[in-house]
Curated annotation (Swiss-Prot):
Sequence repeats lie at residues 67-88, 89-110, 111-121, 122-143, 144-165, 166-187, 188-209, 210-231, 232-242, 243-265. One of its GO terms (cellular component) is extracellular vesicle. The lineage of its organism: Eukaryota, Metazoa, Chordata, Craniata, Vertebrata. It comes from Tupaia belangeri (Common tree shrew). Its main location: secreted. It holds the Pfam family Apolipoprotein. The modification Methionine sulfoxide is found at M193, M242, M244. The gene is APOA1. Keywords: Cholesterol metabolism, Glycoprotein, HDL, Lipid metabolism, Lipid transport, Lipoprotein, Oxidation, Palmitate, Phosphoprotein, Repeat, Secreted, Signal, Steroid metabolism, Sterol metabolism, Transport. Participates in the reverse transport of cholesterol from tissues to the liver for excretion by promoting cholesterol efflux from tissues and by acting as a cofactor for the lecithin cholesterol acyltransferase (LCAT). As part of the SPAP complex, activates spermatozoa motility. InterPro entries: ApoA_E (IPR000074), Apolipoprotein_A1/A4/E (IPR050163). This is Apolipoprotein A-I.
Amino acid sequence: MKAVVLTLAVLFLTGSQARHFWQQDEPQSSWDRVRDLANVYVDAVKESGREYVSQLEASALGKQLNLKLVDNWDTLGSTFQKVHEHLGPVAQEFWEKLEKETEELRREINKDLEDVRQKTQPFLDEIQKKWQEDLERYRQKVEPLSAQLREGARQKLMELQEQVTPLGEDLRDSVRAYADTLRTQLAPYSEQMRKTLGARLEAIKEGGSASLAEYHAKASEQLSALGEKAKPVLEDIHQGLMPMWESFKTGVLNVIDEAAKKLTA
């Protein structure tokens, strides 16, 4: 249960309003994005699965067992469609409630992240500018050496490598220096962000407008209700699978009986 609640919390704490999965203009809710991705995946699985089932049924073994897998597969597909129709509204309600209850927390964290981004952006821009300047200087130094390689013979290759190696080492040292500088400059902001997030979570833990304990209790309650509503639908799935299993079992037993008769004849 904790893993489920933590996963849902991570999803909603991002607070992103990405574009629609199919690039429509209006942003989707978290539930709509998950539902669309799941539908695309399930449709692909259904199509590929039906193709494999059809191939198995058309094989010599399938004909001998008289499995009728395609009919059973279609029946199973209808059963899963009923599952989707029954559980879809319940799951959507759960997502919407959790998203609403974490809205304030996500807003505050996004605000803190944006503040840190604005403060650190000048450092990042400066590092990028210096890095590009070093790359350009490196290119200008290496270009004449590359021309020498094209114009010279193979015996100059070792000499060229000796000339290029120090330049590569200089570039590597520059990158390390920039990384160390950037790490030093960003360290205070990283510590500040860590403390801010810790304070946010501690305030919620101590019993703010919406505590983590309340989120856990509400999520547990919603998941329990979802489980109760899913029981009859899961029973339908079980009933849908039984004909396929019985058909397969009967076919296998018939093949065994025929083989036994041939051996004793």
